Amino acid sequence: KKGESTREIVEHNGAVAMVAITDENHVLLVKQYRYACHDVVLEIPAGKIDKGETDPLKAAVRELREETGYTAEHIHYLGKINPSVGYSEEVIYLYAMTDLTPGEQDLDEDEALDVLEYPFEEAYQMAARGEMIDAKTIAALMMEKEQLGEELLP
């Protein structure tokens, strides 16, 4: 029938992604192989909201520590994005984190990634020039550049 269609929708518990900025104004980026695009990708730290987890902020704090080893003293909420509106329910909550303290990574057994530091402006320009392919990273860097954050933790 005209106007009717069948849709396949991917159900997703949601995710978080963090623009973590050092005192030297460098942003933490992780470099890892992504099977879906068959390539090594440079992106901001991120991760899924675990089943039963209801607070994206707590998930963001956990994921930053697990992936990079860092903890943050100040956190700003940047906003949320729906990266695949045509076929997925996924929402990614974006945060900016500053006043970082280094620690030890706590990666999942199947995770292998390198943590790198890039000057924020260099990372932003890489995203603006199309040199990064990860949508959440591009969006979060653009949002942080415009300082659209609201401080959540003193």
Task: Name these PLM-found stretches.
Residues 4-5, 41-42, 103-106:
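Short small-residue beta-strand/loop micro-motif enriched in glycine and branched aliphatics
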Residues 21, 97, 144:
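Short beta-strand-to-turn element immediately C-terminal to the catalytic PLP-Schiff-base lysine
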Residues 15-44:
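A glycine-rich, hydrophobic loop/mini-helix early in the fold
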Residues 1-17, 22-23:
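Acidic, metal-coordinating catalytic segment for phosphate/diphosphate chemistry
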Residues 8-9, 31, 136:
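Short linear motifs in exposed loops
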Residues 14-17, 48-135:
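Unchanged
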Residues 126-154:
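Long hydrophobic alpha-helical segments typical of transmembrane helices together
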